[in-house]
């Protein structure tokens, strides 16, 4: 980007609290642009937006009924973001100060995010509440992020400002809390906003959903632009006539990087449906793809499963999904059966199974690490379950009656990135040997913000990122077999096993270090959280009461169901240092419940 100072002198011409509009009053941004497409290649986000704003494409927001609610062309985004940046400058914050934004699927969030970058501030997206019964847990989660980031400003739409104000009561770092509308009412400061530098922090991405130890991934402009270029050029092969549709939350790395920032740096239009609206009626997402002829749309596997289960056969006749050329799949373990069921269900609506595009990534590497080859669909291999468990070897099998695990080909690393597999001693493994997945490349994070201890665990010498995942390489392609970290992914949500265990240990009947939580997957890929408790209670009534209470507490805190198993004292396995081994606890549970061969090999364990 040029070193020319950007002068912000455009008047504020509209309120920043968008009001719903009827579809007859507004039209979506077009698919075909008047601007020559440039596939990333920019130095910073703001330089990319400056270019995109010269065209006529942009973001479109739809309500639960599929009606167009708001339109935000890139030209208007630039204008509004610049004006908001001048108002943010009025706080006289040091460059690089953090700004927290509750990231609902709205134009306001996008404007605030880019306003922060124009003002030289570092935004980060905070989640919206996912479970109405977890008010206190949600506020605690927000408070943890505010304190961890030492945020100076916090913003939320009117629907969520109450949560934010409650969370901010104990956050001494904050200088101002408000809504986008209130920010828009503040006076503009007549300043020149300096352009961003590629080595500056672009944003923080919080991971794991932890309420006690949130970790903010530090992503620089350079890392972001490198990852975006790999995604749009090598992964998706974006074209001028592409259009995207998304239900993914803006606070998720796939939603933010893949479906907000990637479309902007390629100047294509996007149609959004709020995550909660998708969850209620996934048909609306498919309708957007069909009606607006969207070509690129990503989902987590559970989203495809939801479509397969919820969309009625009678609805298929109104859909034409033949336009959908890149059906990206990622963010959690990919089960081939989930993709097969989706393809079978929607083939009559024109969906081509070759559109499936499995990929692998994580926030600590900005977003994407590997992509399978576009246009080839989902490729998988059958692996001997016994060899996988006993020898950590991926031994290929034909259909001969032996127990098998089927794993999806997640493709090859993006240009400039390397993936290697190592054993417990850190030695690199050959192909078809199962071990820890490490990644090296320009997209890898600088570290976790203000968290040296967690950074040192994740980043190894040579700037190798320990992903916490387990997998193997075959003919240069990556296959993920499970997770080694203590994160359990349920319906696209990351839940820390430690948080569940600590919740259990708060009960008077449960002693410290006598609870172990992990995830197990059944044959169709559904993840279930299991909580094993060492229990001294003998009364059947008391044991049932404890089981029910723990299930209710987990649901209230995390919005998910769990299985509770009570076992005798000293049952849970421990490492040589006395720590609980979630991997061994999980294996013991599988053996006790006779589920061997029906479950994926490793879903959570010891880092």
Regions found by a protein language model. Give the residues of each.
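N-lobe entry segment of adenylate-forming
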Residues: 1-72, 76-91, 95, 586, ...
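Structural core segment of the AMP-binding/adenylate-forming
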Residues: 2-11, 118-187, 300-301, 306, ...
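Conserved pre-ATP/AMP-binding loop-to-beta segment of ANL
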Residues: 57, 188-206, 212-213, 223, ...
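Conserved AMP-binding/adenylate-forming core of the ANL superfamily
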Residues: 59-111, 131-138, 195, 219-225
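Conserved AMP-binding/adenylation subdomain of ANL enzymes
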Residues: 225-243, 253-295, 310-314
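AMP-binding/adenylate-forming catalytic core of the ANL superfamily
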Residues: 290, 297, 441, 446-447, ...
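Conserved AMP-binding/adenylate-forming
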Residues: 325-327, 334-477, 485-487
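Conserved C-terminal "lid"/linker of ANL adenylate-forming enzymes
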Residues: 514-519, 530-531, 551-606
